[in-house]
Regions:
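N-terminal auxiliary segments of SAM/dcSAM-dependent transferases
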Residues: 1-11
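S-adenosylmethionine/decaboxylated-SAM
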Residues: 43, 47-238
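Class I SAM-dependent methyltransferase Rossmann-like catalytic core
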Residues: 12-53, 70
Length: 238
């Protein structure tokens, strides 16, 4: 398993900054301000990984209000998109004010099935560029193995932090059983903080030095949400 280093991320600094400026322009068209889930640099991280992979089909697991669906469509405008969330079965029972504004795409296929129960292999249909994105707060080793069984090699995980959280992350697994990940993963890239992060919530404390990006006028909205850092991680399976 090849883990991308801070030095390697710094080596891509010019490309990252250029991509971030383009992303800031795209964000002016966002359907709503995301108050939960992907925000700031973490939203850019998903956009960056999806755009770089250029998948023909994307599986989004954990949709909620749909902000990440919109991000995926901006990064891969020609991709087929399949969205999975039990919310779709329950949404009519939840007052709209509890959810807020939502984005539902006419391009996407929506399902209340769990990813593990859906016919993913048939939907992948041998496409080597298929990508899955998980923001579902479920343990990640089962998700990784489900992707492998379905023929998906490109996987992006949100909330891949080493601190105690709502689920077992890949960082937890790296600390506990690194050989398991070594057997399954070819490349492992956790998107860096672009600016300093110092975030506390209950017993959780996230602190990152960042890599010193400038705070340009067009980047201020993204910089404002810099503390919503969720360690978005791209994995390429063997």
């Amino acid at each position: 398993m090849r883990v991308k280093t801070s030095a390697e991320w710094n080596g891509e600094r010019d490309a990252l900054l250029d991509g971030l400026r383009g992303f800031a322009r795209i964000m002016k068209r966002r359907p709503f301000d995301n108050e939960q889930g992907l925000r700031g640099v973490s939203a850019f991280a998903l956009y960056w990984f999806v755009r770089r992979t250029a998948p023909s089909v994307v599986f989004e697991v954990g949709v909620w209000r749909g902000f990440s669906t919109w991000l995926i469509e901006q990064a891969a405008p020609a991709a087929e998109v399949h969205c999975f969330d039990p919310l779709f079965m329950l949404q009519h029972l939840i007052p709209k004010r509890r959810i807020g504004k939502t984005y539902r795409s006419p391009r996407a296929q929506y399902s209340s099935q769990d990813f593990s129960c859906a016919p993913i292999r048939e939907l992948v249909a041998g496409r080597a560029d298929a990508l899955a994105f998980f923001d579902d707060h479920q343990n990640k080793i089962p998700r990784l193995l489900q992707c492998k069984a379905s023929g998906i090699k490109h996987v992006v995980f949100d909330d891949n932090m080493s601190e105690t959280y709502t689920h077992r992350t890949l960082e937890h697994e790296r600390a506990a059983d690194a050989p398991l990940l070594e057997r399954e993963i070819e490349a492992y890239e956790t998107f860096p903080a672009l600016w300093p992060v110092d975030f506390r919530s209950g017993g959780l404390h996230l602190k990152e030095a960042g890599i010193g990006f400038p705070v340009e006028r067009e980047l201020r909205d993204i910089h404002r949400d810099r503390n919503w850092h969720s360690y978005v991680t791209y994995v390429r399976l063997k």
